[in-house]
């Protein structure tokens, strides 16, 4: 049976933390900042943890991710 392939789009978007959770960055951070408040831009800077409902699906895409 052939090896499973890592989903490259997901591999670029998620990092695994030391405790095994998945870290992601926020959307809406590439352009159009003039009409976003300073508070919104500040909150978008921080990374977020993937919710448990999505975790299993994403983990299957990242088969060999350390």
From Swiss-Prot:
Tell me where the signal peptide lies: none
Superkingdom classification of source:
Bacteria
Set out the biological process GO terms recorded for this chain's protein: translation
Gene3D superfamilies hit by this protein: 4.10.410.60
Could you tell me the keywords of this UniProt record?
Answer: Ribonucleoprotein, Ribosomal protein
What InterPro entries does this protein map onto? Ribosomal_bL35, Ribosomal_bL35-like, Ribosomal_bL35_CS, Ribosomal_bL35_sf
Q: Where is the composition biased (Basic residues)?
A: 1-26, 38-48
Intrachain S-S bonds? none
Q: Name one GO molecular function term.
A: structural constituent of ribosome
GO CC term, one of those recorded: cytosolic large ribosomal subunit
**Chain segments carrying region Disordered:** 1-48
The keyword DNA-binding is assigned to this record? no
Family listed: Belongs to the bacterial ribosomal protein bL35 family.
According to UniProt, the name of this protein is Large ribosomal subunit protein bL35
Q: What organism does the record attribute this protein to?
A: Halalkalibacterium halodurans (strain ATCC BAA-125 / DSM 18197 / FERM 7344 / JCM 9153 / C-125)
């Amino acid at each position: 049976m052939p090896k499973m392939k890592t989903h490259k789009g997901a591999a670029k978007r998620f990092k695994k933390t030391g405790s095994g959770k998945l870290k992601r960055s926020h959307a809406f951070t590439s352009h159009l900042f003039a009409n976003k408040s300073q508070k919104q831009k500040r909150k978008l800077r921080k990374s977020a943890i993937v919710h448990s409902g999505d975790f299993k699906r994403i983990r299957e895409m990242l088969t060999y991710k350390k």
